[in-house]
Design a protein with these regions (language model features):
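ATP/NTP phosphate-donor binding region
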Residues: 15-74, 78, 86, 115-130, ...
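Short, Lys/Arg-enriched N-terminal segments with co-localized hydrophobic residues
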Residues: 1-14
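Proline-centered loop/turn at the N-terminus of a beta-strand
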Residues: 46, 95-97
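Short glycine-rich anion-binding loops that position phosphate/pyrophosphate groups of nucleotides
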Residues: 81-83, 104-106, 193-195
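Catalytic core of DAGKc-family lipid kinases
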Residues: 106-185
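A structural-propensity feature for long, helix-poor, extended segments
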Residues: 220-223, 227-238
Length: 238
C-alpha cells in the first residue's frame, strides 16, 4: 500500500480537485483552511473543507471516504504530522496525493508553512510538482483464529507491554519461521517514513523515505547485543 506525498519540482499531471482536512485546535476557526480554499477556487479549482476534530469533545473524528468528492485528486492537511497521518489512514484506499501544511511542532511530513501555501497551490495548478510514493503497513489483531482488528498505517505498528512493569517476552516469526526471541518492553515495526519517529527514539536506523523495507526495532531490550533488523516489505511478521 502506498502513501503519496508531494515534492515541488516538476511532473506532468493536472490537478484541480482538492479537499482540505484541518485540525481546528491548530487552525482556529478554520482560518487557514478557508483562505487556501478561497485561493484554489479563485484560481479555477474546486475544494471542500473538512474538520478532523470534534470541537465538542476534542476527540479525533474519522474522515469517511463518502465525505470527499468522487473526483478528488489532492488532500491538503493543516495541523501537524499527526493530522496528515490520520488523513492518510482514513483515505488510504483512494488514489490521491497528500500534502501537509505545518501548524504543529515537528513537521517531518507536513513541512510546508502556511505562508508558502499560495505558491505551492500555484505549482499544483500549473503542473510543476513531483510525486513520491510511500509504503504503508497492514496490521491485524488475531484472537482465536479470527481477525478482530485490522488497520493500515503510514508510520509504525507497536506491540507494547502496556502498564505491566515486568519485562515481556516476544517470539517473532517471519514468514512462519522463528526470527528470534526478544526480552523487551515492546517491538516497533516501522516503515521508512516512520523511521524518524518512535523507531529513531528507540535507537533504530533512519531509512530513505522512498525505500521499501520494514524496520524491526526492540524497545529497551534486555540485551546489549540486540539491534534493529531490516526486513523485506513483503515479509509477514507475527
Amino acid at each position: 500500500i502506498k502513501f503519496i506525498i508531494i515534492i515541488f519540482e516538476y511532473w506532468s499531471f493536472w490537478m484541480k480537485n482538492f479537499c482540505i482536512i484541518t485540525n481546528s485546535y491548530k487552525d482556529e476557526k478554520n482560518s487557514i483552511a478557508n483562505k487556501i480554499s478561497d485561493y484554489i477556487i479563485k484560481k479555477g479549482g474546486s475544494c471542500v473543507v473538512l474538520n478532523n476534530v470534534d470541537t465538542a469533545t476534542g476527540q479525533y473524528r474519522v474522515i469517511l471516504e463518502e465525505q470527499v468528492p468522487g473526483n478528488l485528486e489532492c488532500v491538503i492537511t493543516i495541523g501537524g504530522d499527526g493530522t496528515l497521518l490520520h488523513a492518510a489512514k482514513d483515505l488510504e484506499k483512494l488514489d490521491v496525493i497528500f500534502i501537509g501544511v505545518n501548524k504543529g511542532t515537528l513537521g517531518f511530513l507536513a513541512e510546508i508553512s502556511p505562508e508558502e501555501m499560495e505558491g505551492s497551490i500555484d505549482r499544483l495548478l500549473n503542473d510543476r510538482f513531483n510525486v513520491e510514493s510511500r509504503m504503508m503497513l497492514c496490521g491485524q489483531v488475531i484472537r482465536n483464529n479470527e481477525v478482530v482488528y485490522k488497520s493500515n498505517v503510514l508510520n509504525d505498528i507497536v506491540i507494547h507491554r502496556g502498564g505491566d512493569m515486568a519485562i515481556s517476552n516476544f517470539d517473532v516469526y517471519v514468514n512462519g519461521q522463528l526470527l528470534g526471541k526478544f526480552q523487551a518492553d515492546g517491538i516497533i515495526l516501522s516503515t521508512p517514513t516512520g523511521s524518524t519517529a518512535y523507531n529513531l527514539s528507540a535507537g533504530g536506523p533512519v531509512a530513505r523515505p522512498d525505500s521499501h523495507m520494514i524496520i524491526l526495532t526492540p524497545i529497551c531490550p534486555h540485551s546489549i547485543g540486540t539491534r534493529s533488523i531490516l526486513l523485506s516489505r513483503n515479509d509477514e511478521i507475527e
